[in-house]
Amino acid sequence: MCGIVGIVSQSPVNQSIYDALTLLQHRGQDAAGIVTVDDENRFRLRKANGLVSDVFEQVHMLRLQGNAGIGHVRYPTAGSSSVSEAQPFYVNSPYGLTLVHNGNLTNSSELKEKLFRRARRHVNTNSDSELLLNILANHLDHFEKYQLDPQDVFSAVKQTHQDIRGAYACIAMIIGHGMVAFRDPNGIRPLVLGKREENGKTEYMFASESIALDTVGFEFVRDVQPGEAIYVTFEGEMYAQQCADKPTLTPCIFEYVYFARPDSCIDGVSVYAARVHMGQRLGEKIAREWADVDDIDVVIPVPETSNDIALRIARVLNKPYRQGFVKNRYVGRTFIMPGQALRVSSVRRKLNTIASEFKDKNVLLVDDSIVRGTTSEQIVEMARAAGAKKIYFASAAPEIRYPNVYGIDMPTKNELIAYGRDVDEIAKLIGVDKLIFQDLDALTGSVQQENPSIQDFDCSVFTGVYVTGDITPEYLDNIAEQRNDIAKKKREKDATNLEMHNEK
């Protein structure tokens, strides 16, 4: 899962992109990068491992000159954590092209071989984002002309859609031309468009979430539609075209459960409101199914994604709502940390209990989901150590039983605590007295309350049904082998830092 930003302006964009990336930091804390186009049509790039605030110092910001640029925060699901795989990526032909990407391609191996045979293009890393950039570059190269028109750009995106499968929201810049943003035909990963008027001219911005627009003074216009491409010239002219044959909106349900900020709006859905609805429905289920609900003394969220959900549950059950955990905001989100050992060590560094809220009480803990069970088990241990008598646990998402292949680090079914287990077995493993999960129809219904036009979602982690229709058991076995923690460590050890000029 990553966050992406692109701005075409009439004034320097370095600070605006930086500010937008800080607002998308929750989508990835592994690496960050910005590339701008200066007055001499040169790319200015800075990317490195770390948080946005660590990667960009004043000297870097001063060198990132230009009125157009793109940015990225990374959480790796493919490839390694090497800085050589940080984004943006760059190719010098045709024109000079750079790209940022959020998502995951599901036919990377096939594409890499095909690209080399067809175009003699070498992809130097294991990143599917570099591969995607080269696919797009190859299609743009076919026009063999000095100046592209918007239709040429749309044609290249259309051919790219035909080649690649999976989830992808992308923003690319073409030297001497402009910026193009496009979204996969299923709309799995989010992408929004914003604009602002400056000195009588319109400036445009793309971002993974609407919150990134708000803070830098851009007005939300709309979501980029599934399969659509929007092209903005560096002079500020905007063009849009549907580039997929059969687009359909099936957004990832986990965006609303976990990834997106509550103050964002994605595909016509207020993330905050959707989470309140999740709390309403889960609270009603608890009241309906638990005979001992009166024994609950207090409702406590596992911060921060579940705060709004837990507050609504407390109101439905007519129970006190308390903040029993204090979060250290300078530790990354544990679920999206690569490596089980790092996830385990970070939980206790991230959270601390307020003992008075637990001592001698029957506590209902509320979390957005239970993935590996790492966080849940340790949180329960902390609650017991703080003096809780009984611990009930409610998950705002159903049981996660299947791997994700569209950009979330759930690569192996054996890493998922719910795989092959029922609710009682999961409860025993994480150490709670009672456990309840949200029903899938209640979860999807919570989001549809905000936008009834969304007919379906990617719910593959709950159902095992993958919306792209190309996922086989062999593919799942392959990514399990490639993406387990041992394989990740080996790639990081072998990684070589080969990249274009980086503003040190």
From Swiss-Prot:
The active site is at C2. CDD domains: GPATase_N (cd00715), PRTases_typeI (cd06223). Pfam families: GATase_6, Pribosyltran. Its cofactor is Mg(2+). Its EC number is 2.4.2.14. One of its GO terms (biological process) is 'de novo' IMP biosynthetic process. Residues 2-235 form the Glutamine amidotransferase type-2 domain. Pathway: Purine metabolism; IMP biosynthesis via de novo pathway; N(1)-(5-phospho-D-ribosyl)glycinamide from 5-phospho-alpha-D-ribose 1-diphosphate: step 1/2. Keywords: Glutamine amidotransferase, Glycosyltransferase, Magnesium, Metal-binding, Purine biosynthesis, Transferase. Binds 1 Mg(2+) ion per subunit. It is an enzyme of class 2 (transferase). Mg(2+) binds at T305, D367, D368. One of its GO terms (molecular function) is amidophosphoribosyltransferase activity. It catalyses: 5-phospho-beta-D-ribosylamine + L-glutamate + diphosphate = 5-phospho-alpha-D-ribose 1-diphosphate + L-glutamine + H2O. In the C-terminal section; belongs to the purine/pyrimidine phosphoribosyltransferase family. Catalyzes the formation of phosphoribosylamine from phosphoribosylpyrophosphate (PRPP) and glutamine. HAMAP family: PurF. This is Amidophosphoribosyltransferase. The lineage of its organism: Bacteria, Pseudomonadati, Pseudomonadota, Gammaproteobacteria, Pasteurellales. The gene is purF.
